[in-house]
Regions:
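Extended recognition/assembly regions associated with phosphoester-bond processing machinery
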Residues: 1-292
Length: 292
């Protein structure tokens, strides 16, 4: 928020699942605010600021865009009217999220796995959000992605977990002949333990592309060092494949940094160009020293 106040036209913040009163009250964020600003801190004002944050940002050049958000895919939202609207900056209220309508209208969007279709039937609905998690979770803020391409294309762990098949179908359905949504950059799904995703975030300097062609679920138990040894060091900057999903790491000064033992902060630098094939993403890593 301090960065946004200092440069409002250049800093854009997307709302994540923690920017919510329920999460803030349960996980100590309200206590942190009171500790910094006193017992009479205006919590209502802070919550209202959360309400004004967009849950997704489409960043692009006019014909090519990336979906930038905290969580994952939201099949109930159709961005085509927003992307086709005039002007460099435009906004749209989410309105009703038509997840069930989308699933029923798109046969085959989950591939051939009957288990994935069962998850969709159980968890997808048409609804108007009242909060980020009621009556259902907003996918842009909560949903996740699989790490490997050979696991079920839809699952549920805390929220829906999307594989490459439905992810790329949703991106294609969000596109038109004139405008393409090419991929996703996000920063969710972190853990205080070195599981498959956190190990890859640490091994790759804080920016990781899902569904690597040289990996499958048999590599899920690899350590950080094993990942570094078995993987060719990515280019920096890297090209952005169509339909790719990129996860950014979390701050080291957190339970995640303590639990996973990393001491660097990371950012992704996105370089746009007139043609999407020339877009690049760079990893910026800064070592951080602090007392634990």
């Amino acid at each position: 928020l301090r960065l946004k106040m200092a440069s409002p036209a250049q800093v854009h913040i997307a709302r994540g699942n923690h920017e919510d009163f329920d999460m803030a009250s349960r996980y100590g964020f309200l206590d942190e605010v009171r500790g910094k600003y006193g017992e009479n801190a205006n919590l209502t004002k802070l919550m209202r600021a959360y309400d004004l944050l967009p849950v997704v940002v489409y960043l692009g050049t006019g014909k090519d865009f990336l979906q930038v958000n905290h969580g994952g895919m939201e099949p109930g939202y159709d961005p085509r009217a927003l992307l086709a609207a005039p002007g460099n900056a435009r906004f749209q209220l989410l309105g009703e999220l038509k997840q069930k309508t989308y699933a029923q209208a798109k046969p085959g969007w989950l591939g051939e796995d009957p288990g994935a279709r069962e998850w969709a039937a159980e968890h997808l609905a048409d609804f108007i959000p009242e909060t980020p998690s009621t009556p259902r979770m907003i996918g842009f803020m909560w949903n996740d992605f699989t790490i490997f391409p050979d696991v079920p294309q839809l699952g549920y762990w805390r929220s829906l977990v999307f594989g490459p098949v439905p992810t790329r179908r949703i991106l294609a359905d969000a596109s038109t002949e004139q405008i393409r949504v090419r991929g996703v950059i996000r920063a969710h799904q972190h853990s205080a333990q070195l599981g498959p995703l956190m190990s890859r975030l640490v091994a790759n300097g804080g920016v990781y592309r899902h569904w690597q062609t040289h990996e499958d679920s048999s590599h899920g138990g690899q350590s950080v060092e094993e990942i570094r040894k078995s993987s060719r060091k990515p280019e920096n900057p890297q090209p952005i494949p169509d339909g790719s999903v990129w996860t950014l790491n979390v701050s080291p000064d957190s339970v995640y940094g303590t639990g996973c033992g990393f001491d660097f902060a990371a950012a992704a630098v996105l370089s746009l160009a007139p043609e999407f094939k020339d877009w690049r993403i760079s990893t910026l890593t800064v070592n951080v020293k602090f007392g634990r």
